[in-house]
Amino acid sequence: MYLLLMLPPLLFWYLYQMSMRYPEIPYPIHWIDTNEALLELSNQLAFVRLLAIDTEFDRFRRKYGINLELIQLFDGEAVYLIRVGALSNLLSLKPIIENPAVIKLLYSGSEDIQVFKVNGIAPKGVYDLQPASQLSGFSAMSLAGLLQEVLGVSFDKSKQTSDWSKPQLDREQIVYAANDVIYLVPLYNQIKEGAARFCTTDFINEENALLEVVEVSETKPRLKQRHRENFNRHEQALILELMHVRDGLGQILNKPPHFVLSDGHIEDIVSRRDNYAGTEQLKAYSAFFRRGYDFLSKADRDIRAALTMPWPPPKTVHARNDLPRLQKVVLSNEKIEDLLQSYTLYLNEQYVESVATYLCNGIRRYLRELMAGADDFNFPPYRRKLFHQYLNTSGFDLNQLVEA
């Protein structure tokens, strides 16, 4: 009898919750958390020609490595939230994500491309709205700013760094995840119009082509500038070796290496290596070393082995002409700034300020590499071509930049 009396209010509460679930999102939201559902989704999306994409991942924040947690897709009709941790693999998505005929809309997509590549998928047909927006006359430098500028939409980004690996995402996370993709399509339409107006469509296409070949960022341990400044070569070698030890310990625990042993702890071990106190010293550093004897013993053995490293051999000194060397030229910062100011004015005569500003990105570094004799530039060819067109038009001699 009690249960019968409770049914009406429970039913009312359930219907109310369902009706009020995501009123901010004007599209249905579908969860994909099985391999079968992912395969079905891939078949369903086989005929779309425009797909908005975003990802949420953990890059050494809570776990070891680059861990893809959530993929958000929007096909113009519905939002699909793919729980990566619940799936055995993402291979069912390859035909869609790697199909160049399907335009994939992203915003600031370099890391999204990398995290897909880590998972065995190389996206094709990408369209990054961040550079495209600036090359289309919009001034905002963030997605939230662009949404406000173009669509008049306010976007709360506070959930961006929340824990996306939780078994159940909270309501705010779900709304945030959906918002990250549903506005990319109307933004794309506005940006295309701006690109046509300023004749920058080819520039945008080149930016997108460069994005597709971006490589996964290095994650291996590296010395920091303070290590090079404050420690001798032997100590630097010891610090780097201990960083590799720490990396291995982080893999065992599936935790970011700096959670296990901080840079300060490593520096302390190296600075006081003659008085290294072993397991007791490690237990004072981190709770991870107080959890189990086997892990503590392994860490102690590996650290002691690392501290036995001898001095590294002397650096090889090559004869002057043994290796190709960059020319050592000193450029005048004042003259570089004068040149950039003139180039900006030249671009402003052809484009609006936001386009001109974007086209000037990277010019300083390019100039220094060019004047040093480098021939492998990390600088988009279309921007290089525009700059040299200006130099030819103005008759400017780059040798004027060299300090007398």
Predicted regions located by residue number:
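N-terminal accessory regions of nucleic-acid-interacting proteins
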Residues: 4-51, 55, 401-404
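Intrinsically disordered, low-complexity segments enriched in small/polar residues
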Residues: 12-14, 20, 174, 283, ...
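Conserved DEDDh/DEDDy metal-dependent 3′-5′ exonuclease domain
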Residues: 29-39, 46-53, 57-194
